């Protein structure tokens, strides 16, 4: 999309598709509208944030969690209050409230701290408490309270705001560093924020030993931590992670937020091993898992089609 202000008619059409009041649009098409609104939100368009927020009346846990993620990636302080409203809304699904809290951490504004501290102390649900813990730590880090002049090498992932920054550069050789990080990622005595930083440093290293070290994270007792491991594998598009991701998706005893993230990661990798399992679980009894597989398959179909643009860009009259 160009740098010129987008006509209101385009915003209105994207909002219409995303909110889907008439139930006429399939989930995959609504994702494409969200993709367009994401691009506009990142350019500072407040109308895109407003359009996304209106769709939180929907009942799709998957879509709402993705909308919260997009708001967190927008960089807009304007998105803080809508996200606070979502965290405060106890009728929203856990995965949606978690993503809204994480989004507040991604935005990094100190005005979010009171609500995050409240639910870190009071929420009965561990994923919410842990997310708030991470978001608080990230806001403190971003605002210079805990940076200590760290040297962090730029990476290919810098366009995405992570729940925690990667660990700073290490003096050790890579093999020794990965061995150290592999022991730390599973060390329950270390703070959660520290272990998340370990996770993202391993992602940035990105070799096969780092992938195997990250795989150990699937043994963690925290569903939140396990789901982030799957998310990271989706970012890395690492074929070496496929067996572990398939195992997670196939495990019907695993919590939905972890299985859903494994499905999305498999969709990103999209090799021959991924397709059959995604097709199988697109009919899963757990809605968020089934929908994740459906969206993943749609993305794969788009990649195969050779289309230049995944986003839905409305054509409106001048």
UniProtKB/Swiss-Prot annotation:
Q: Which residues of this UniProt protein bind Fe cation 2?
A: 227-228, 260-261
- Which Gene3D superfamilies does this chain map to? Leucine-rich Repeat Variant (1.25.10.10)
* Xref: InterPro entries: ARM-like, ARM-type_fold, Armadillo, Deoxyhypusine_hydroxylase, PBS_lyase_HEAT
HEAT-like PBS-type repeats mapped onto the chain: 96-122, 194-220, 225-251, 258-284
Q: Where does Fe cation 1 bind?
A: 65-66, 98-99
Output one GO MF annotation: deoxyhypusine monooxygenase activity
Instruction: Give the note describing cofactor binding and stoichiometry.
Output: Binds 2 Fe(2+) ions per subunit.
GO terms (BP aspect): regulation of cytoplasmic translation
* Catalytic activity entry: [eIF5A protein]-deoxyhypusine + AH2 + O2 = [eIF5A protein]-hypusine + A + H2O
Q: What does the record give as cofactor? A: Fe(2+)
Q: Pfam families from the xrefs?
A: HEAT_2
User: Where does the UniProt annotation locate this protein?
Assistant: Cytoplasm; Nucleus
Question: Do the record's keywords include Hydrolase?
Answer: no
**Would you say which domain of life the source belongs to?**
Eukaryota
Which keywords describe this protein according to UniProt?
A: Cytoplasm, Hypusine biosynthesis, Iron, Metal-binding, Monooxygenase, Nucleus, Oxidoreductase, Repeat
Its pathway is: Protein modification; eIF5A hypusination
| GO CC terms in record | cytoplasm; cytosol; nucleus
Q: Its Enzyme Commission number?
A: 1.14.99.29
Its biological purpose:
Catalyzes the hydroxylation of the N(6)-(4-aminobutyl)-L-lysine intermediate to form hypusine, an essential post-translational modification only found in mature eIF-5A factor.
Which family is it part of? Belongs to the deoxyhypusine hydroxylase family.
Q: What is this protein called?
A: Deoxyhypusine hydroxylase
Q: What is the lineage of its organism?
A: Eukaryota, Fungi, Dikarya, Ascomycota, Taphrinomycotina
Q: Which gene encodes it?
A: lia1
